[in-house]
Structures are given as structure tokens and as C-alpha cells.
């Protein structure tokens, strides 16, 4: 979020990891924290500590941010902290600043929306309905700018549409324009929850177009996109269903040829080298494993902690056609002591795959 800072309010034991993450991302200048001491828990004044701590941080800044992503933590839940009072007081003290409600509460990850889902929703909460900017579409919840060669971006460009994304916003004004899109698109599974809430709040349509390794699913997603673009055109410019189908078939046929050629080229280089991959590289690790196996690659292990409902079909397919494929849960306690080396060369796709396999050959995006 442009022109925003993050403020974490938590104990110093948890703060260590947060500080290291900020440093790793070279974002320390946008990061501040308020330490909660044991006496604050005993005295029952966590609300005051949070309010005064955040106030102190903001008063010390030479330039006030447009927004503050305020992260409360598990302690606030355990002690029944009145967060509405906290945010209300801060908004009264700093009316020119937008306070975004964020939560660092891993204890809640088994119930309801996950911390990741709640954060991807929260960063779009400041957007308002306002006007609708014709010929613009907003991509919601992505960490990186969509590649210029992506199917979605090229199809939108061919239809004269502009795609807006939060990672591409350079200032607060550009960020606020995200709410003006004709409709919203989300591609990343944890972003779907927030995108649906945003679309409902601003009375827009939302298209969920997740990344897939199945050609038929990709084609259907692009068909949905083209049909939605068609409804936004003037009546005299609307193409009939047959024209859309022909356009889509030609586009997909061309892209499949390119994809198959790229897969063949990669197979010629990698050969029969064992491949391990994880869920952090792509939200559909089983789909990636299935695609590679169908193209002759030697995939041996997938590191994941759960199977998404979106991958049920490919999971069932793998059970039948590749029952020897190993699925390893990264959160199992035994993963701390299992050997992390192999006798043969292994290609790891994703950081966790590289860590648990001990591979020195890593593909990471």
C-alpha cells in the first residue's frame, strides 16, 4: 500500500521475527513497533498501551503517512482488548490518517478466515465506491504486478481495457483509483475472500480466475473474462457468442502450442533429474506436479500441509496414475529431524522444497 506504514503492537519475543522480515524486505523505514511488557498484561491497560504507543510513533515521524496498517496480536484476543475503542481514539487523534485493521494472530488460523485472507481484505478496506472508470479493471490481492505477457493482461489490452493493481500504485491517489474499476478480478486463492467482500461492498462484479495448470480450466476462465468484457460494451459493439468462441479457440490454440514447446525444451534440459516442489511456490502444487508428470518429468515429492478443494480432481488423478508420489506435511514435528540430503541430484521448486531436500538447485520466484 503506497504512502503507508506498518505498526506492530506485540511482545518482544514475537517482534524478533517481524523485525527480521522487515529488514529482509528492505522495508525497515516503513516499519515501527510498540513493545507490550508483562506489567501491561497484569495491569489490564493494553488499550492504553496500544493507543499511546501508536500515538508516540506517529508524533515522532517527520512526515505523516496516508495510512497505518496497525497489527494487533494474540494478546489482544486473549485479554479481550476493546479494539473498537483503540481504533476510535486513534482516528479521533489523527483524522487525516486511515487506520487499517490488521491482525497477526496465528492462533486463529484454524477458525474462519486465515490471517493471510484477513490482511488481503483489510488493505482494500479504505477504497470507496465513488465513480466507475470505464474501460478499467482492478486486480485484487496479488503480491506482484501481473506479467505483461499474462493471458489476462493481453486480453484486456486487446479490448482496450486498463488493468489496475496495488503493487503498481506509486502514491495514495493511484491506490484510491483501484475502487473505480468496472469489475474486480482475483487470481490468488487467499485473495478471493477479500475480493468478494470488496465487490459486495462497492456493488461490483467479481471474477475469480485462479492460476491453473489445466488447459480446459484456463480456457473456461478466459471465456468468463471475455463475456464480462462483452457486457461492458455498447450494444452496437457486442460480438455474438460464436465470435467470442472463435476468438478464444484461436488464442488458446496458439498459447497451448507455445506452452508445450516450452515444456519440451525444459524437459530436454532437466531430463530425468528428480524434482521436489512445495506449496509456497504456487498455490496449486498438485496441479503443477500433475502437469510435470504428464510431460515426462520425474517428480518425487510435494511438500504441502493440506489439499485445497480446488485440487481434488488432480489429487484423485495422482492417486490413480502416480501412487508413488510422496506428499509431505511441512508442519509435522518429525520434519525437524528427518535427513535433509539425497544421494542424487535434486531440483527443488520452492524454498521449502529446497530446505527439506537439501537441494542446492532451486527454482524460486
Give each language-model segment a name:
Residues 1-365:
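An N-terminal assembly and electron-transfer interface module characteristic of large anaerobic redox
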